[in-house]
A protein has these predicted regions:
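Conserved catalytic cysteine-centered active-site region
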Residues: 30-34, 39-50, 78-130, 241-261
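Phosphate/pyrophosphate-binding loops at sites that engage ATP/ADP/AMP, CoA/4′-phosphopantetheine
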Residues: 56-70, 210-225, 246-249
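Buried hydrophobic positions in well-ordered alpha/beta secondary-structure cores of metabolic enzymes
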Residues: 4-6, 60, 72, 90, ...
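Short beta-strand segments
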Residues: 75, 131-137, 159-160, 170, ...
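Flexible, glycine-rich active-site loops centered on histidine and acidic residues
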Residues: 124-157
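Acidic, glycine-rich active-site loops and adjacent beta-strand->loop/helix elements
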Residues: 1, 75-81, 107-112, 135-140, ...
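Condensing-enzyme catalytic core mediating Claisen C-C bond formation in acyl metabolism
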Residues: 1-47, 145-202, 206, 210-213
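Short glycine-rich or small-residue beta-strand-to-loop segments that form or flank ligand, phosphate
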Residues: 70-78, 104, 229-230
Length: 261
């Protein structure tokens, strides 16, 4: 059996009220008022994705012996260093053994799940020791944009191994498509955003349900047997839309924390 053996998280204390931001910029972008609910987390001036990753990892590893960690994977699209291994800095801050293998993963917002997949593949291959997975984001957005209300700052961490498993890994399915709902070119500070309906209609009504259905079929799991369905939704109500298309009951939909992170 392989899977997650412990977990941790870090969410900055500071908050940006979506209502306050929307009201301040509604004169230029009235559409912001539709997203003026809840708040998002906001990193302080001395925080970035690396410092948040360290805090999440410390939360996950609290009270544990770290000598058995054999690898560290750090997923983010906002690594502070372009040519200096960020994962190595996380390992140093955690005082992990110098003999561990460390890797940065980026290039897309699925960097965190890519890091988790790499750790699970490592465990499935029977490699010795646990793998530490950290994911963190500190994304910048244009002032007055919808993304300013959506891009919360936070980090999560997991250890993956084959003993003392608290969440068994049953399987996965991946779909690799060059879907351009947004992008950020090298050297650019902000994302270039395309029509948001394109994201909803093409990605969340087509590609995401296809991946979920394929994963369930591969593992021979009835969609109605799912008790917890968690989707990283950029805007509200997408979880219900995807769950319905996948045959997952509405009662299984978990809070995406969109309203507080």
């Amino acid at each position: 059996m392989i899977g997650i053996t412990c977990y941790g998280a870090y969410v900055p204390r500071l908050r940006l009220s979506r209502a306050a931001a929307a009201q301040a910029n509604a004169w230029a972008n009235p559409g912001l008022l539709a997203q003026a609910r809840g708040e998002r987390s906001m990193a302080n001036w001395d925080e970035d994705s690396l410092t948040m990753a360290v805090e999440a990892a410390r939360d996950a590893l609290a009270g544990r012996n770290t000598d058995g960690i054999g690898a560290l994977y750090f997923g983010s699209t906002t690594h502070p260093f372009a040519d200096r291994q960020n994962a190595g800095l996380v390992a140093a801050a955690l005082d992990l053994p110098e003999s561990i293998s460390s890797s940065d993963l980026g290039g897309a917002q699925k960097a965190g799940t890519s890091a988790l997949n790499a750790a699970l593949d490592r465990a499935a291959a029977g490699r010795p020791g646990e793998a530490l997975v950290v994911a963190a984001e500190h994304r910048r957005a244009r002032p007055g944009s919808a993304q300013e209300l959506q891009y919360g700052d936070a980090a999560a961490a997991f250890t993956v191994g084959s003993s003392a498993v608290i969440a068994e890994f049953l399987g996965s399915h991946s779909v690799s498509v060059d879907f351009v709902d947004h992008y950020r070119a090298t050297g650019q500070e902000f994302d270039y955003i395309w029509e948001e309906r394109w994201l909803r209609d093409e990605a969340f009504q087509k590609w995401v349900p296809a991946a979920v259905k394929a994963a369930l079929e591969k593992m021979e799991i009835d969609p109605e047997a799912i008790h917890h369905f968690v989707l990283a939704e950029p805007v509200a109500k997408l979880s219900a839309l995807v769950a319905k298309r996948c045959g997952i009951t509405e009662t299984a939909i978990a809070d995406s924390l969109l309203g507080v992170v």
